């Protein structure tokens, strides 16, 4: 049966033709594995690191149902070197393999294996990694994280998958970290050596995730669906992801309700702006259209050199000439909730709105959101 496997390349949505192949037998399906949880997350990050995108094969609805309801692997069916090769497990650390089956009766008693049971999944939930090995799709993995870990952690994972970054698949612990003990592994710097990230292509869009969540059941999926409008696309660093989440998410989650932002947004300069900047246009990290406000994250890379500073100064003068206010945020400022709130107040003022955050214990909520996001992207709490 011929099918199409979808991947995101530099040109956008790409369809890759898959050769015609025979249907797997019932015995082959029974011995197959469906990876979920940490195992699927590790493998997805390994695939993005190696390929730059996800090359796995889509299944048609009938195939998905047959795989889910037939998979019941035994210990003899699980060959660890193959799972290490495709990135599902780390060869360096002892960890449970996370597998998905369609019913409790399909589980086998095996040491080192954690089972998740789900009798039905929406179309587009399972991808074929290679014959006999399947994984949750990016959308389905976000829902699994929302149900098993938390909604903000799932939002952070979705933001990673919508961005041009992938966190490391190596090491004993993977973000999102869930305890202070494992947080100690990360460094204070923006790009800790223990975690790091890779430049890749996005494998998800906010609209695609929202469409998937619309047919999912359960409170966790519905809560995550409400957060989809606050996701951004094509971000290029973990700190940009944290910055946009803080400024975009509603007050009730600990955010500052300044969204939506347009990322990588091109502003064409008029004659005066071109004359003062020497540039035909500027590309904004995060542009708030209603406020005519450009929010820039200033990391160390590319901004600390003399040439980089001069470029930024000219660019900012061009934007100011166009009536666009520019604010530059760094890691230190993002850790100061009073400073972030002052900037959010200014954005609301530019939108002709009053900044009214009436959430009880709002500072604690804001700090909790910041530390949860930092943990999700492999950074220590502040």
Language-model features and meaning:
Residues 192-382:
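Surface segments flanking catalytic/ligand-binding clefts of nucleic-acid enzymes
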